């Protein structure tokens, strides 16, 4: 292969001269790093590794790059959420704002085409970034056959890649429902929900977590009769603050129905109808069973790590009791030179978490400091209103016996939200009673998914509520509600409420 140096010149503003960065390629291996999986974690890690001077091979078995998030997850669902929100506003909200449109209709096929085109543009963008950063893409399913060797089975046969390091970034898959076969037409996963040919008249959603609420909202806005069935007594999934979850039932005012503390016993098709048998948990001790009919049932009970055919057992990597790949704080597995990030390891299954882990992991491989703060990972539910949170809930702090302060500021008292006609929701800040350090932030309201990022920045740098309260915020903005909540947490009272 030879010994190569690629010299890149970049301006150095610190010394006024030119800094030379050399890219040193491996002389004994086909690659310095093979990344298995080109989802959010994998493709970001591959690009960052290449930027740090490594020779990188990305292995991907799917026809398009970007993983679940980009192809059948985060991105297409946000396209549908945004466009159905606009449709809902045009149909129900524009008139009282002085906007007259006549009869408002939607074209479902055109809506789906828009989603497809958005996905294509972004997947194509990843391919261009690979070319720009000289990341080699190998198509096929990757299997680790030795600590320094990956075998890729593709349409053109088998290719073997010798490498110094291997990074597992294979993501996750839908958790199956016992005894149920998905046809992605009537009994569907989130993948099927993103590619239905028409809007069902009646839809049941099993699981009122992030995915269930988002996709349920899409079809409810388009006219479907949507009922979400949840085993727990709250909606929003794991990690949501219970006060936010309670307020979140504002979705019921929009037309979505909920059956909480309900266990689904079975799902079966009878002709063109799907029957779902459920029973309330309380009633299970002596109550009556109930069967509900629907046109489509969406099962969204979570995801599980995807490690199929990776060959982990062959190299001595044992999964934990939840099917995850165990790693240390540098994302190293029990086998030297093999690393793992994203949904296949511990922590929330979030695209942005995987991306950051990918960057930090490859920096560690290059000998750079490794730091990842799992207390500063935001979660967002992209419904209307949006929900965003970071770090501790009030329930967490009570369990820990932590002395804390809790203060809220309603969007009803925020000038921008009220002027925009979006007064529902609030910002809730939890802070240490003794030190004023922020312990958690929870938002339900307009732009909650954007506003939470300021709270994440504050969390990452260990800010106190006073720190945020003393930062000048533009007026009028919804972000002022975050400042006011921190002001209340710091000194006991906000200004505008």
UniProtKB/Swiss-Prot annotation:
It catalyses: N(6)-[(R)-dihydrolipoyl]-L-lysyl-[protein] + NAD(+) = N(6)-[(R)-lipoyl]-L-lysyl-[protein] + NADH + H(+). The active site is at 475 (proton acceptor). GO terms for molecular function: dihydrolipoyl dehydrogenase (NADH) activity; flavin adenine dinucleotide binding. NAD(+) binds at residues 207-214, 230, 264, 302. It is an enzyme of class 1 (oxidoreductase). Its EC number is 1.8.1.4. SUPFAM superfamilies: FAD/NAD(P)-binding domain, FAD/NAD-linked reductases, dimerisation (C-terminal) domain. FAD binds at residues 60-69, 78, 142, 170-172, 343, 349-352. Disulfide bonds join 69-74. Keywords: Cytoplasm, Disulfide bond, FAD, Flavoprotein, NAD, Oxidoreductase, Redox-active center. It is found in: Cytoplasm. InterPro entries: Class-I_Pyr_Nuc-Dis_Oxidored, FAD/NAD-bd_sf, FAD/NAD-binding_dom, FAD/NAD-linked_Rdtase_dimer_sf, Lipoamide_DH, Pyr_nuc-diS_OxRdtase, Pyr_nucl-diS_OxRdtase_dimer, Pyr_OxRdtase_I_AS. PANTHER family: DIHYDROLIPOYL DEHYDROGENASE, MITOCHONDRIAL (PTHR22912:SF151), DISULFIDE OXIDOREDUCTASE (PTHR22912). Belongs to the class-I pyridine nucleotide-disulfide oxidoreductase family. The active site is a redox-active disulfide bond. Homodimer. This is Dihydrolipoyl dehydrogenase. It comes from Manduca sexta.
């Amino acid at each position: 292969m030879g010994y190569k140096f690629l010299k890149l010149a970049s301006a150095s503003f610190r010394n006024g001269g030119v800094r030379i960065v050399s890219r040193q390629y491996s002389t004994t291996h086909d690659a310095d790093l093979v990344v298995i999986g080109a989802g959010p974690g994998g493709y970001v890690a591959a690009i960052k590794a290449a930027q740090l001077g490594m020779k990188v091979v990305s292995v991907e078995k799917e026809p398009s790059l970007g993983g679940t998030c980009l192809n059948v997850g985060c991105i297409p669902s946000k396209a549908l959420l945004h466009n159905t929100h606009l449709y809902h506003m045009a149909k129900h909200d524009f008139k009282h704002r002085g906007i007259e449109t006549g009869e408002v209709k939607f074209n479902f096929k055109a809506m789906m085409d828009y989603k497809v085109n958005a996905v294509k543009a972004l997947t194509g963008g990843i391919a261009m970034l690979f070319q720009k950063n000289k990341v080699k893409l190998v198509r096929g399913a990757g299997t680790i056959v030795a600590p320094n060797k990956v075998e890729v089975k593709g349409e053109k046969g088998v290719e073997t890649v010798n490498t110094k390091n291997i990074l597992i970034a294979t993501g996750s898959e839908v958790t199956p429902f016992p005894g149920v076969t998905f046809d992605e037409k009537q009994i569907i996963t989130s993948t099927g929900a993103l590619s239905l040919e028409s809007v069902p008249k009646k839809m049941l959603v099993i699981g009122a977590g992030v995915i269930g609420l988002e996709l349920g909202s899409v079809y409810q806005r388009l006219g479907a009769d949507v009922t979400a069935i949840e085993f727990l007594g709250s909606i929003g999934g794991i990690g949501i603050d219970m006060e936010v979850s309670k307020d979140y039932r504002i979705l019921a005012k929009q037309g979505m129905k909920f059956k909480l503390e309900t266990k689904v016993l079975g799902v079966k098709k009878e002709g063109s109808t799907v029957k779902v048998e459920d029973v309330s948990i309380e009633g299970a001790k002596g109550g009556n069973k109930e069967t509900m009919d629907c046109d489509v049932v969406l099962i969204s009970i979570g995801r599980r790590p995807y490690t199929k055919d990776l060959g982990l057992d062959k190299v001595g990597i044992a999964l934990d009791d939840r099917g995850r790949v165990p790693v240390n704080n540098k994302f190293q597995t029990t086998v030297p030179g093999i690393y793992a990030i994203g949904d296949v390891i511990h922590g929330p299954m979030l695209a942005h978490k995987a991306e950051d882990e990918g960057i930090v992991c490859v920096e560690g491989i290059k000998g750079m400091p490794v730091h990842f703060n799992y207390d500063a990972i935001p979660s967002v539910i992209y419904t209307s209103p949006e929900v965003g949170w970071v770090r501790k809930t009030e329930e967490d702090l009570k369990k820990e016996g932590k002395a804390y302060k809790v203060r809220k500021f309603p969007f009803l008292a925020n000038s921008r939200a009220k002027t925009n006609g979006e007064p529902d929701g609030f910002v809730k800040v939890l802070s240490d009673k003794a030190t004023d350090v922020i312990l958690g932030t929870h938002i339900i309201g307009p732009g909650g998914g954007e506003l939470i990022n300021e709270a994440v920045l504050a969390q990452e740098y260990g800010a106190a509520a006073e720190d945020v309260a003393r930062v000048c915020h533009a007026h009028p903005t919804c972000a002022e509600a975050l400042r006011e909540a921190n002001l209340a947490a710091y000194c006991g009272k906000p200004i505008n409420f």
